[in-house]
């Protein structure tokens, strides 16, 4: 999560003649790396989510690509599910960095478009060990649902704290937690979590009519055959 180190590593790679750079897996680092790869005219494939990594497609971002879905796309899916479940009021707590701010921006815009009310918005750092203050402020507003704009295992902390403090509403996470480590660290505290994910993660559960099911299953089979 050190943007300075990410830039340093990227510069070293392009100076050593790398024909492409794969990374970073997080939004702040990926954004910091753009200037380096653009200057070197070296393609970069980011594994982070933010739409800002690739848009607007200007002279610098011409060299940048990414694999995950954008937060804008996933925010639409989350809000659509909230509407379907009758949610009226929503709370948000996200990383105090480009990932959390990007999610807050697109999520709030989608809430407004669908007529839902954002009643509280909080931030925390990836390395924080307590979010009690933020959780209490969220609980005071009594939202029907809360979205945690975080990724990886640090996304567990707000959810665990809300549960421990008695929150009984719906808790949503981003596609940044769609991995075994989140489930391992979260344990019972993340039971019932709602989150969006790309079709490849649930390929076997998709109906046969789903357009990309066959392609997803083929990819999984090939990947597991080679890498286990």
Model-derived segments and spans:
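Internal alpha/beta domain cores that form substrate/cofactor-binding pockets in large enzymes
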Residues: 118-122, 134-141, 154-170, 175-176
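Mature extracellular/periplasmic domains of secretome proteins
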Residues: 10-15, 36-39, 136, 164, ...
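Extracellular/periplasmic periplasmic-binding protein-like sensory domains
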Residues: 162-228
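Extracytoplasmic ligand/sensor domains, especially the bilobed periplasmic-binding protein
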Residues: 4-5, 18-122, 170-198
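A local structural motif
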Residues: 17, 115-123, 142-145, 167-168, ...
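Short, well-structured alpha-helical segments in soluble
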Residues: 3-19, 80-81, 129-142
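Second-shell loop/turn segments in exported
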Residues: 19, 61-68, 136, 204-209, ...
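Hydrophobic alpha-helical
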Residues: 27-38, 144-165
